[in-house]
Amino acid sequence: MPSEKATTRHLPGAVETLSPRTGRRPETPAYGSWLLGRVSESPRMRRVRIQGMLTVAILVTNVIGLIVGAMLLTVAFPKPSVILDAPHWVSFGIVPGYCVLAFILGTYWLTRQTARALRWAIEERTPSHDEARSAFLVPLRVALAVLFLWGAAAALWTIIYGLANRLFIPRFLFSMGVIGVVAATSCYLLTEFALRPMAAQALEVGATPRSLVRGIVGRTMLVWLLCSGVPNVGVALTAIFDDTFWELSNDQFMITVLILWAPLLIFGFILMWILAWLTATPVRVVREALNRVEQGDLSGDLVVFDGTELGELQRGFNRMVEGLRERERVRDLFGRHVGREVAAAAERERPKLGGEERHVAVVFVDIVGSTQLVTSRPAAEVVMLLNRFFTVIVDEVNHHRGLVNKFQGDASLAVFGAPNRLSHPEDAALATARAIADRLASEMPECQAGIGVAAGQVVAGNVGAHERFEYTVIGEPVNEAARLCELAKSYPSRLLASSQTLRGASENECARWSLGETVTLRGHDQPIRLASPVQQLQMPAQSADIVGGALGDHQTHTIYRGAHPTD
């Protein structure tokens, strides 16, 4: 049998799944059983499936009831005999005829009533509130119809057989009555199970479930009454009738009690199994959904198919997951606005104004000729170009564990070493700058950009007011990187770093850079030595106007490769 079929683990708590011993439990279907199909199943296939299940379940239940009734009437209570002491036209005419007629009319009537109550499902539309409430009454109507047919049989057969022998009266009333109640209850629970997909659709419109009993407690007490109360009443009535009418021998009385007890024990087990299964499957569905949430999967909601407190549990899970999804959307949006690292730091501890000194490396990137770019292209095209440009920057900065701290028009500022500490922020910044330069040259030749890299001590923290602040870094390396970026626009490599930055880098990274001119940047008092990727440093003639200081006779300098710089 497929791995989704369940059997009792312990009563009344939960139900164990029967499956091959593979070491793991199979995933529970959305409706709690593979018999009910998938949520994505076509409405027509679902109708055929449900109609077939209902027909088979009701017919089998009542056929078993007839077999048990025949055993009670012929073996448990042999005298008077329904075959020898009753008219043959009754035992071989009226009784079989009624059974066939009851099966035909009962099947027709139940099918018609069920189809009428579920017309909205047949028409493949959303039910109205009244239609949804009516759908919840289908199991009760099925149970009442089955109980009516058994009651009619008990009344008819009691009268007919009673006319032949009055001792038949208590026997038929007792046997047909007990079997009818148990069969009707079994049909109620089986119908409730089969209509889970329809109940799920009805619950979606907010209809209040209507049923024979309310809640888990009511359902449990009903099954207890049938599993425990009816057998005890049956044994008691057998003793009373034996003393009053039948005068059975001790052996016959024992056989009668055993025959009465055995079928009710089997029916009781089946009813309790159904009850435990109906109770356990929603819990199991929620449990497995919680496991998926624990693993980070927030993609799916549960199908609410139970009208008891278990349905409220399923709704509560869906509300919880929706809240988690909303939180993840806010977290993702927050991370996109301020950076993943800043967002993670804000979650770890309460944000506050102020900052702390950090040793960081800074990369500043700015497009060359941005004014001409904006005036020569449509605005939409400029936006698309900027998005491609910033995508390259963000990809490389994230790859090297940095933080894109700001987008300023067509420029961006990336920080390495804050808020997350890095053992070698200079290596990360220099590698990022080289990667950005290479990708821009190959992927976006129409968009050239200057890149400046600097490193040193900064203050990193939240700046602003208590109502509105942002995470940023303030210090000399930021200004230096911006000046180097402007200067780099006039160099073939479009990329410059300070010798101070190379001092903090590893030998492997330094081997990729060459030292060049010593210049004084605009707004700075002390000269710095420039560094550029190997074999790409070349000082342009107009650089004196850019750096804001005369280079005098020092237009050409020795280039040191593969070693740490010294001023």
UniProtKB/Swiss-Prot annotation:
Task: Please indicate if the UniProt record lists Transmembrane helix as a keyword.
Answer: yes
* Ranges of residues in domain Guanylate cyclase: 361-485
Residue spans crossing the bilayer: 57-77, 90-110, 142-162, 173-193, 221-241, 257-277
Query: Gene3D superfamilies, from UniProt?
Result: 6.10.340.10, Nucleotide cyclase
What membrane topology was assigned to this protein in its record? Answer: Multi-pass membrane protein
Q: Please state the span of the N-terminal signal peptide per the UniProt entry.
A: none
Recorded GO molecular functions are:
adenylate cyclase activity
Query: A Gene Ontology biological process annotation?
Result: cAMP biosynthetic process
Major localization listed first in the record, in broad terms: membrane
Q: Where in the cell is it found?
A: Cell membrane
Q: What are the record keywords, sorted?
A: Cell membrane, Membrane, Transmembrane, Transmembrane helix
Q: Where is this region: Disordered?
A: 1-26
Question: Which protein family is it in?
Answer: Belongs to the adenylyl cyclase class-3 family.
Q: What name has this protein been given in UniProt?
A: Uncharacterized protein Mb1354c
